[in-house]
Amino acid sequence: MNLDKIFHLKENHTDVKTEIMAGVTSFMTMAYILAVNPNILSAAGMDHGAVFSATAIASFLGTLCMALFANYPFALAPGMGLNAYFAYTVVLGMGYSWQVALAAVLAEGLIFILLSLFNVREAIFNAIPFNLKKAVSVGIGLFIAFIGLQNAKIVIGGSTLVGLFSLKGYNETLAEGLTASMSDAGITVLLAVIGVIITAVLVVKNIKGNILWGILITWGLGVICQFAGLYVPNPDLGFYSLLPDFSNGISIPSLAPIFCKFSLDGVPLLEFAVIIFAFLVVDIFDTIGTLIGVASKADMLDKDGKLPRIKGALMADAIGTTAGAMLGTSTVTTFVESASGVSEGGRTGLTSLTTAVLFLLSLLLSPVFLAIPSFATAPALIVVGFYMVGAVSDIDFKDPGQGIPAFVCIAAMPFFYSISEGISMGVISYVAVNAVTGKAKKISPIMYVLALLFILKYIFM
């Protein structure tokens, strides 16, 4: 096989060794999703092992499409923020089944294929004001970090709606009248806090795969605590053994519990459309923003600041999302962690092909990834939130017409525990504030349509 001819290595001033090493680097920085995504989606009632398999296979397919359709070194996987919206907003917040949420993801993927074919996706993206785009990223970052703090039990419910975990008199009532005491939960909170510190140090030191290493080290400390008797497994209380279960050998968890399990039972058409739209908007921001941002670091943009072959890259994302929904996972999107592979010299689809193969091989290590607890992945959520909140520096808060809608969008996501509410309120407030202050003609017609749809949602839902 002539890899140079397929991926145009010489034309892109790279070689096979550089591309493969870059692909390995991208995988190392993204592999945390194999542990985090099952933990998040299982909160919605989905089978933990099946979600792991779906995550690995969907990541493989999406990244492979990127290599073949666009020849870019970008990798794809179920997106952070989108998985949180799936589990914590659509299912736990709005009360719909995960089968309904999967149906929305499938619909989004099919719509994306059409939008990518007819270049509508770029038009929607361009219609949203720059500051509001950045606000969506910041709001999702806060939302993800908040979920991480909750998963770690650092933030708990209380008389003030949310409160800080207390070492004194801790007592948590679980399902069916079971109660977790300080001796049960205290060690996991401590390990999560240590995990945040360790991951932060790795980020500051710019260690490759810092998020994945943070998860593994935190998990390792938990295993040590289990051997020392400080962490006592008790499945009835939700504290499972931290040791990988190889009793059945190396086996790949079945997709059967979640494969092609779609439902529209009990969901009003307008509300289903809003759910789909929220997936669409966030994925649009995620994908195009990541593509342009990472490509600019690799000098892949043309003289007009546009990315050649972007249609192929967007199509890979759309196909990845559609395939992912059928497999049983949330929206697949291009990962900003692809920048790590680019920084290692990755310039072609051979980098993403390498990453794709590693995602497929990860299926053989399912007992390892499935043994990683939520207190070990919580620091990853918090640090990913930190990365996303960094976009706040790009928002023009000196202009109230831009800053106020951006702030509303940011604040609404964690406070209302919903990404879609943040987008809705951000769009409505932007149109309202600017339309009545003499800037009505500067607002895109698409924004007026979106604002009207969101207002109708609040009136009739």
Predicted regions and their residues:
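Loop-to-helix transition at the N-terminal end of transmembrane alpha-helices
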Residues: 45-64
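Alpha-helical membrane-protein architecture signal
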Residues: 13, 17, 194, 273-277, ...
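Hydrophobic/aromatic residues within the transmembrane alpha-helices of Major Facilitator Superfamily
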Residues: 24-31, 64, 68, 145, ...
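Helix-loop-helix junctions within the multi-pass membrane cores of secondary transporters/permeases
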Residues: 2-37, 58, 79-88, 92-140, ...
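Helix-loop-helix hairpins and the membrane-proximal interhelical loops
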Residues: 1-50, 215-310, 452-456
